[in-house]
């Protein structure tokens, strides 16, 4: 039997490969990488062959291939899910596989699942900034989140299996992720290098010829740079490998990927300034997206909410993000240029 730690990861290619590719690249560079056996689920057989050259064992399949996913999870000491955080069939397949592993070995595998700060959303529709700040070290506050909120159906299902004693679960909630990923998997053409949220807002603004916001753009969201988010996953993994008894899990196992916060007006104003400089708008001042534009270009009112939070648990792992709001805003000119060069798929799920 292998003495290596088997880590199974999904979401390393296509749009979801922005997070998953970054995490996988970090694992491949990890000081203990030779002690890992890494398997990865992906749909593209060509990219699967490329992954082999990195020492990763590809498993060709999609999130709908639940039997494949269940088997991969049943063979894993640790599962890291970074694909579609609302895809219930694949999540339940992972949970079934990890339960089978527990029943066969008596050992609780670790499940690091990617959720999102969209779970914290209110119904502000861009009209006000909330004074509610969620803390990842306050399980009572987080348990009170409505089950109808984004991601809660999957999050609570995972927590329930942890409570039953079959797994140790850890929920990572990234916020607005920014920056262009630059690592070996991107350069090999395997992983996606671009975020989802801002390119969608920017592309919608370019199509209307003017920077846009939901409502007044007053709502507040957190943000995190992609490389620093990848570091959070690795710090969490390291803590679990070193001594899982010291790491909060289950209903207490939330870890926010949030370094700073911004208003959507602030972001859209900077987008507008870039559009003016690039000849794509005459005025940098954002205006409200119309109902028709929201239905045509965007995924509804997902980004019109407040989702304020404090990353207490994440920082307790030793996570010390350095890139803040000013860096995020400064990155948007490049994003506008990127969206002009290659328009982004609209109406994508962005939280």
Question: PLM ranges: what are they?
Answer:
Residues 291-321:
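Conserved C-terminal active-site "lid" loop/helix of NAD(P)H-dependent oxidoreductases
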Residues 199-227, 232-235, 247:
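A conserved pocket-lining segment of Rossmann-fold NAD(P)-dependent short-chain dehydrogenase/reductase
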Residues 2-33:
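N-terminal Rossmann NAD(P)H-binding glycine-rich loop of SDR-like oxidoreductase domains
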Residues 85-89, 96-197:
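Glycine-/Pro-rich loop/turn segments that contact NAD(P) or position catalytic residues
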Residues 210-211, 239-298, 345-351:
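Mid/C-terminal beta-alpha module of Rossmann-like enzyme folds, strongest
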Residues 180-199, 236-254:
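Glycine/proline-rich active-site loop of Rossmann-fold NAD(P)-dependent oxidoreductases
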Residues 325-351:
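Amphipathic terminal alpha-helices
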Residues 40-105:
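NAD(P)H-binding glycine-rich loop region in Rossmannoid oxidoreductase-like domains
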């Amino acid at each position: 039997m292998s003495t290596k730690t088997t880590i199974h990861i999904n979401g390393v290619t296509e749009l979801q490969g922005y997070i998953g590719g970054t995490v996988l690249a970090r694992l491949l560079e990890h000081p203990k990488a030779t002690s890992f056996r890494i398997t990865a689920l992906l749909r593209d057989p060509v990219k699967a062959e490329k992954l082999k050259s990195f020492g990763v064992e590809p498993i060709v399949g999609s999130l709908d291939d639940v039997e494949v996913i269940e088997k991969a999870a049943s063979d894993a000491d640790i599962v890291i899910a970074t694909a579609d955080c609302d895809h219930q069939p694949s999540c339940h397949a992972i949970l079934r596989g990890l339960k089978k592993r527990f029943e066969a070995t008596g050992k609780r595998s670790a499940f690091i699942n990617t959720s999102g700060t969209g779970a914290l959303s209110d119904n502000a529709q861009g009209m006000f900034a909330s004074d509610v700040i969620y803390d990842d070290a306050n399980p009572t506050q987080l348990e009170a989140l409505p089950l109808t909120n984004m991601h809660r159906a999957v999050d609570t299902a995972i927590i329930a299996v942890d409570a039953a004693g079959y797994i140790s679960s850890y929920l990572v909630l990234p916020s607005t992720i920014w920056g262009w990923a630059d690592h070996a998997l991107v350069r090999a053409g395997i992983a996606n290098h671009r975020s989802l949220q801002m390119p969608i807002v920017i592309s919608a603004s370019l199509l209307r010829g003017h920077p846009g916001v939901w409502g007044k753009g007053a709502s507040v969201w957190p943000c995190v740079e992609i490389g620093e988010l990848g570091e959070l996953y690795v710090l969490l993994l390291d803590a679990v490998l070193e001594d899982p008894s010291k790491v909060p899990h289950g209903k207490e196992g939330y870890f926010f990927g949030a370094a700073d916060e911004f208003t959507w007006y602030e972001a859209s104003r900077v987008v507008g300034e870039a559009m003016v400089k690039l000849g794509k708008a005459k005025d940098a001042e954002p205006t409200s997206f119309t109902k028709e534009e929201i239905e045509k270009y965007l995924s509804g009112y997902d980004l019109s909410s407040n989702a304020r939070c404090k990353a207490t648990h994440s920082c307790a792992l030793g996570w010390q993000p350095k890139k803040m709001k000013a860096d995020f805003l400064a990155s948007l000119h490049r994003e506008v240029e990127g969206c002009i060069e290659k328009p982004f798929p609209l109406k994508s799920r962005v939280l």
